Amino acid sequence: MSLSIGLLSYRSHPYSGGQGIYVKHLSRALVQLGHKVDIISGPPYPELSQGVNLIKIPSLNIFEEEDRLRSFKKSYFISPLDLFEWLSVMSGGFPEPYTFGVRVREYLKKSLSNYDIIHDNQSLCYSLLDLQKEIPLVTTIHHPITRDHKLELESTNNWKQ
């Protein structure tokens, strides 16, 4: 039986961090087994094998900015979610799982019927919990994301970063 799988990853760097590499190899194996796979990811986006579709969920991607303080744009005032994401990062928070969850839920409201199952790869966002009422939801937890956040904070040279 062939399945249509939505594989979620809030951040999928293609060369480091693990999530982008994990979803690349998992999606390739699932396609080889005959399944249809969409990677639904926030930036940075993964490099994927042939036959795997990428659905890009935009975000501010502030963690990639050299000067996060100066990355602010007036347009953030238009979107409460963008403003929350920027303010949270600037105060030492790690909002990406939450903000990805809100954004991906909006995408899935329109596209849920395209999938037989959703596989959440580490995003652990609250907004996905109600999906279980409508579609099977599987979650993979690799390790606590608080470890990533702690390492990020420890590696900064000054408060601007």
Question: How would you describe each model-predicted region?
Answer:
Residues 53-58, 136-137, 155-158:
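Short, hinge-like loop/turn segments at secondary-structure boundaries
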Residues 12-13, 90-93, 147:
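Short, basic, glycine/proline-bearing loop/turn elements
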Residues 96-103, 147-161:
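Nucleotide-sugar donor phosphate/pyrophosphate-binding loop at the beta->alpha transition
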Residues 2, 40-103, 108:
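A conserved catalytic-core segment of Leloir-type glycosyltransferases
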Residues 16, 46-49, 64, 125-130, ...:
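Short catalytic/ligand-binding loop motif for oxyanion handling, primarily in non-cytosolic enzymes
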Residues 5, 117-119, 131-151:
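Active-site proximal beta-strand in glycosyltransferases
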Residues 1-61, 111-113:
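N-terminal subdomain of nucleotide-sugar transferases
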Residues 92-96, 107-126:
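Short N-terminal targeting/anchoring amphipathic segment
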